[in-house]
From Swiss-Prot:
Residues making up the signal peptide according to the UniProt record: 1-34
Name used for this protein in its record: Uncharacterized protein YoaO
Source organism: Bacillus subtilis (strain 168)
Keywords recorded for this protein, A-Z: Signal
InterPro entries: DUF4944
């Protein structure tokens, strides 16, 4: 009788441990959003597609663009155009005149709070139009009078990588 109770005790402990592991794994997998990331060859830009929390119109994504260059150049850099290509076809231009990177430094603002440290654009892209497709971001910018262009291919980031 004592042996039977001992076995039941161990089975309950093992079952409890397995339930905790399964719940933890489920939360890790389901809580993560599909994310696409990429960097330009020059190392000056990094971009990602991120799932929006605003899902009233269905699952949708937006694009983040981060400057990875020097802080000194950031103050003089202006993004003239951001273009998104899906499966080699032009999907959309950002339709904004220009982004002055001095407004996206992440620095503290005089009245309190912090500036954004990246450009967010292409809001409300439907999930089925971008996820599972080849996605490329083309950035055109100038630092002072020097104009440059960079293409950034975005790759799906696995859920287990931060």
């Amino acid at each position: 009788m004592r042996k039977k109770n001992n076995i039941k005790k161990w089975l309950l402990i093992i079952a409890g441990f397995l339930i905790i592991c399964i719940i933890t794994l489920f939360v890790m997998v389901s809580g993560n959003k599909v994310k696409y990331e990429g960097s330009g060859k020059s190392g000056l830009w990094m971009s990602n597609l991120e799932k929006s929390d605003k899902t009233s119109i269905g699952p949708n994504y937006f694009l983040n663009l981060y400057w990875q260059g020097s802080k000194k150049e950031e103050k003089w850099t202006v993004v003239e155009r951001i273009t998104l290509y899906v499966d080699g076809e032009k999907y959309q231009d950002d339709n904004v005149d220009e982004y002055d990177l001095s407004e996206y430094t992440g620095d503290e603002m005089p009245g309190g709070g912090r500036m954004e440290d990246h450009i967010s654009t292409f809001d409300y892209m439907p999930e089925d139009e971008v996820i599972g497709h080849d996605v490329l971001v083309k950035v055109e910018w100038r630092t002072g009078q020097k104009k440059q262009t960079e293409a950034i291919k975005l790759h799906k980031k696995p859920w287990y990588k931060k």
